[in-house]
Amino acid sequence: MKQSILGAWGGILLSLSLLSAHVTAQTIRITYPESRAVFQRNLDQTSIIYVSGNYFQPIDSVQARLVFENPGQGLSTNWQTVQRNPQGGVFQGPVRGTTGWYRLEVRAFTGRNIIGEDVIRKVGIGEVFIITGQSNAQGFQDLGAAGAADDRVNCVDYDNFANSSLADPPAPKFQQLSAGALIGPRGQSAWCWGILGDLIAKQYNCPVLFINTAWAGTTIRNWVESSRGQVAKNIFAIGTPNENFPTGMPYGNLIIALRYYCSLFGLRAVLWQQGETDNVPLNLQRKEYADAMQFLVNQTRADTDRYPAWILARSSYNQGKVSPSIIQAQSDVIGTYNNNVLPGPFTDPIQIPRPGDNVHFGGDGLRQLAQAWYNTMDAIFFTSSLPLLPLPQPAITTTCAANGSAVTVRLPDGYSSYSWRSGEKTQALTISTPGVYRATLKDLKGNTFLSPAVEITNPIRPATPTITLARQPGTPATGDQQVCSDSVLTLTGNAPSDIRLIWNTGAITRTLSVGAAGAYTVQASNLFGCRSVQSAPVNLVVRPRLIIPIISQAGTYSLKATVPAESGFGDFFDWRRGSNALQNQNTSI
């Protein structure tokens, strides 16, 4: 066996490369919430933003913070841990903050190293309102609606005016409340609400979100009938094909908003502006209106198992006539003890006579209406109305399916229904096609929850890795590799950042030092836990430790190298003079 006079062999460096792998430039991405989402604050001015997203390479933890968009518009937070040791490519968790308008920033860690960041601009903690009632709440185009000047005043960007769908709205989108904005799902302009939003944002230094479910021409009876599942009739279209309101309407939009947007973002109050049609032409009496109004308030609470606050405008003016009975009925509901119903503006004296049909506000009347609403939202209102806070986002788990070529995404127990965007109605979904998957969950009352989004990329089963020698990159290693017993063999994994390397020793690492004889293989494992097949093995043969030769003088001008006979070595030697190798491998020189 050949020996070196200068010492034993050093370690041999091998490298591992993958045949192919998915590579993504972005390490982490926020998928919820969307820009301009506003989360309802509590009485102590705080709230929780439930954040979720995807990551695309192994990470140890995710942190988030809120940074004010503009000086004076909030209190920036310190970094908060959203989740430790996230699994399956999805992270989720709460971020706590105070009233303000923020950038939501997240960062991903491996160990102490930041390996990825993302940001969502314009996310708020403030006030959320659902508008409902009839035309003076719904609004119109071309009557002088003024948009909000403050960038922090927002509305839901969803139009259900024509379709009158009873299905859940699409994933929430928002827009700044400009003059012509359609305040989803049914508002027809900024109406007075843009100005009201400006007033609230300025006075309380907070963002505002409006959702509008009002329906022109509706009576209090229409709202009660549709809440009971009965067909509501449009009194202005009797005998025409449009006599019946669409199925479930007008109540459908209101209860969907309470179950959907309120669950996700919370709610300060329902703003009710209605009563004109119950005056003219119906001439409804005090008790009937009061009973119906209280029934409607109670029904929204029974249908959600929550206790939303209401603010009732006192409104009855229609074509020059007012109704003390309607006004008193509205006041009766407001005055009911422990009802969480508060007084809104008395609108009958505003802009008399009114333009056009002498019922709808317009021009400066909309400014007056907004001011009247604002005047009722004083400090007492904000401390006495009981807000509903956003509900936690359901947890989600992702694992590799048994066949190794699909991913199983599982939603938590405790919900009454599960519905995937791809159409399935199951609690767990096995996915073999790349895409973004999200589910809608409902509790027994129909309150809606959105799961975190899961992004599945190809290949679901990673490619099989190969092992190559460092001195021969790109060439798969073949045959046995040898080291001496006092040395180690170091295997280095060269793989894309979204892949983990799992050795047959159980080690999960990119470099592996081994000194025991045997066969070594490696598997590629992705974020979902799906593994490739085992690589071709590298067989390690371990030779006994080389004995340091003893050099002695054999003659006047010769040297001799010897090792103990029992060592089994001594056939060949490498001789050197200084750093120069000599062309002699004999025992003497």
State where each predicted segment sits.
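Bacterial Sec-dependent N-terminal signal peptides
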Residues: 1-27
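Cell-envelope and extracellular/periplasmic
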Residues: 26-391
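Proline- and Ser/Thr-rich low-complexity, intrinsically disordered segments
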Residues: 375, 379-589
